[in-house]
């Protein structure tokens, strides 16, 4: 595998120097299983303003790399930026949710703003059940869910450091100081 990738890299360097742009693009598209070439193909599509190709390349990358969390999130972030550029709010909400479930808490406020009001509380509760701990904590703080904060502190008293300022002004203040 390593030798094959090295050979492909050498071939690409020769094409960059002596080949036509079309030959370079064809080479890149034949080697999309290599993340470096997928990144190049995505960048070429962005430069050409071809957002449907960006989306397709990112989705294919997610499918191929679903067992590799780092690459999976990289391709999800490509879709995130693609949907920002195209203004596709539903798809943007979906990819934000996928990033949240993958442990990226920074997408919470944007995701929440994209959810229709009548579905918001149900979707938040659903996400709380599936969220990794970093995202779970972010949601509790953002939504001021002192009931769940108190519950979390009872299970793991070290969480008190994170939640104490919210709990000290709540009905759970006495329980928080006892912990």
How should these model regions be labeled?
Residues 1-179:
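Eukaryote-biased, non-catalytic alpha-solenoid scaffold regions
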């Amino acid at each position: 595998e390593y030798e094959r990738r090295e050979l492909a890299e050498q071939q690409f360097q020769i094409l960059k120097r002596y080949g036509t742009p079309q030959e370079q693009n064809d080479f890149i598209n034949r080697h999309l299983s290599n993340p470096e070439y997928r990144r190049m193909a995505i960048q070429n599509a962005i430069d050409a303003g071809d957002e449907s190709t960006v989306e397709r390349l990112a989705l294919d990358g997610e499918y191929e790399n679903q067992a590799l969390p780092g690459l999976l999130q990289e391709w999800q972030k490509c879709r995130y930026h693609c949907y920002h550029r195209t203004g596709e709010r539903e798809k943007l909400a979906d990819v934000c949710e996928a990033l949240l479930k993958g442990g990226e808490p920074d997408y919470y406020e944007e995701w929440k703003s994209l959810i229709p009001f009548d579905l918001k509380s149900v979707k938040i509760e659903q996400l709380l059940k599936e969220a990794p701990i970093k995202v779970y904590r972010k949601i509790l703080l953002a939504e001021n869910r002192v009931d769940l904060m108190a519950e979390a502190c009872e299970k793991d008293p070290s969480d008190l450091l994170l939640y104490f300022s919210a709990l000290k002004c709540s009905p759970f203040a006495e329980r928080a100081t006892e912990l």
